[in-house]
């Protein structure tokens, strides 16, 4: 696992063949008092199968950086690439797990995951899609809670559903935006251990901020 704190961004060499490449990226927001620079000349490379954790204080630009990898926002200058191609919009090759779970409250845990699988793989048979959902709920230890709705689940269980949903469409990069921030210390530690185990077993490429 590779850990970077924000002051180290600029010291990371530019690499054109990286799985994820962030090349000389800057982000500037206009304000009433003039331009506000959030990121300035950031260089970062992530190789396939790496778990990279970006650590920094609140407001330092961590979420902005991951939003550019996710495709939710574009850099003011520089470029973000995945497998050599510029990232210009969100896509199923990059799945985000947010702090606030982002589950549909009227659907069960199973259906929340199934919705993602069905959207990304509409041509797969229903049996295949159901099997994918079962596999990924089992991966996070929720096979016995598949029938429950988010309101019936603990915070840790909701985040497990979010992780299962993200992994179920087999993204190239799993993006974690402070996914454990709303959890108690014990649950946070358990989920961190589970996530590292899943990463090791399935050779995922993960970017996480905290």
Which residues fall in each region the model found?
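Short helical segment in ABC ATPase nucleotide-binding domains corresponding to the A-loop/adjacent helical element
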Residues: 110-118, 130
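Catalytic Walker B motif of ABC-type/P-loop ATPase nucleotide-binding domains
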Residues: 174-177
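Conserved signature/switch motifs of ABC ATPase nucleotide-binding domains
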Residues: 148-151, 169
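Helix-to-loop junction immediately C-terminal to a conserved catalytic motif
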Residues: 70
């Amino acid at each position: 696992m590779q850990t970077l704190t924000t002051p180290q961004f600029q010291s990371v060499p530019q690499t054109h063949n990286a799985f994820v490449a962030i090349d000389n990226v800057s982000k500037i927001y206009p304000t009433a008092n003039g331009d506000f620079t959030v990121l300035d000349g950031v260089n970062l490379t992530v190789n396939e199968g790496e778990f990279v954790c970006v650590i920094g204080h609140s407001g330092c630009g961590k979420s902005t950086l991951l939003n550019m990898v996710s495709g939710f926002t574009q850099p003011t200058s520089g470029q973000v690439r995945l497998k050599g191609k510029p990232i210009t919009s969100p896509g199923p090759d990059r799945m985000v797990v947010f702090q606030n779970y982002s589950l549909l409250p009227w659907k069960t845990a199973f259906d929340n995951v199934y919705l993602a699988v069905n959207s990304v793989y509409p041509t797969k048979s229903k049996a295949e899609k159901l099997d994918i959902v079962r596999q990924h709920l089992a991966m996070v230890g929720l096979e016995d809670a598949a029938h429950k709705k988010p309101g019936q689940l603990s915070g840790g269980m909701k985040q497990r559903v979010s992780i299962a949903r993200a992994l179920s469409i087999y993204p190239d990069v799993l993006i974690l935006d402070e996914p454990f921030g709303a959890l108690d210390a014990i649950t946070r530690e358990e989920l961190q251990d589970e996530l590292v185990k899943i990463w090791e077993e399935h050779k995922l490429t993960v970017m996480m901020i905290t």
